[in-house]
Amino acid sequence: MKTTIKLGLIASCLTLPFGAQALEFAGYLRSGVGTSTGSGKQQCFQLPGAQTKYRLGNECEQYAELELRQDLLTLDDGSVFSVDAMASLYNRYDRALKFQGENNGSARMPQMYAQWSNLPSLNGGSLWAGRRYYKRNDIHISDFYYWNQSATGGGIEDVLIGGLKYSYALSRKDNLYQKEYATRHDFNVAGFKTNPGGELELGLSYIAKAGGRDTNSGWALTAQHVQAAFLGGKNKFALQYGEGPGTGLGYTGNTTLDKSSKSYRAVEFFDWQVTPRFGGQVEAVYQKDVRPGRQDQNWMSLGVRPAYALSEQFKLVTELGHDQVEATGGTRKLSKFTFAPTWSPKGPEFWARPEVRCITPMRPGTKRPSARPMSWRRARRCPTPAPMARRGMGRT
């Protein structure tokens, strides 16, 4: 066995292996310092009604994850019993490092679970119970977890039958902000071969009626196609539909909504690495929310982050993102541009980590139907070195 230690800088990943007794330690950290012209402190931008923001130079918090995983027992049949625990720390830039309080930050345990994996009786599948990150699908440049079944519960995962992998999870709470505890059932079937290098996965979520007053049941359906070896990277296309509490799509939504409330979403994004020095990621998201009482809303998001390496360790990274929300009262728009000279000691590729970036994000003022002409605002940020890195900030 070996232990994997992941180290890095600023939303980046670096892996260093060395011998140990089946213990794995992983960490993630992002941190930085910055200012904004006219206000002094760094500002971050997100359009009201948009579910995400483009994150390069647009994250105003310290965030860390510290994870330990231990294989406790390996049986004669090859199955392995293991435990996993993760602590997370969150604190806003303009607050003292207290990691507590609604306006300051938090210290949590987003993962603490046990798993019995590689079971012959399940054709290599596994059993698990606890709180864990589970089947998370996200877009890196906007940190959008559009299909995320992370939860507190238990389940059966990746049981191979007839060339397909079947999974089922039962949970009660799937994110920090879920007010009503509702029983959620998640069914997944993966491995449909659609074309050379392409696979389809289907997922169905059913949310039972919660215990509070005026709550309802709901459901959501997701279909996702993944195309490997696409321009040197990977392409993902997902269609999602939900009703009632299922309108949360990737999460449990508002439990007071009934079947007259519906949400539709289309997600398309891909990575590319057409040469060793030129790579990036591009995304397009469209979501339509149907609500009673003329509370409908449409959200569209387009973004791209190309990276070109001038040398083996120095990149020029840019990010351009645009969000548009059509809602009661008119249409809102927000565009953001970021330029980031980047030191990348592990190589020139887009996904090479760690990275240290000196960031200059700019955005025009939010545009409304009666707004004045837009003007650009700029913030400068040169992040401080961070000792750990691991991809993603979970909401469980």
Residue ranges and their predicted role:
Residues 41-49, 176-180, 212-214, 244-259, ...:
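Solvent-exposed loop segments that connect transmembrane elements
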Residues 19-26, 69-83, 119-126, 160-167, ...:
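Short loop/turn motifs that connect adjacent beta-strands in outer-membrane beta-barrel proteins
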Residues 31-37, 72, 87-93, 131-135, ...:
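Transmembrane beta-strands of outer-membrane beta-barrel pores
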Residues 2-3, 7-123, 271, 305-308, ...:
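Beta-barrel outer-membrane channel/assembly domains of diderm bacteria
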Residues 187, 192-327, 333-337, 343:
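Detector for outer-membrane/organellar transmembrane beta-barrel domains
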Residues 32-56, 96-110, 121-211, 378-388, ...:
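Surface-exposed coil loops of outer-membrane beta-barrel proteins
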Residues 59-67, 108-111, 149-153, 182-186, ...:
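Transmembrane beta-barrel architecture of outer-membrane proteins
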Residues 332-343, 355-363:
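A contiguous, mid-protein "functional segment" used to position or interact
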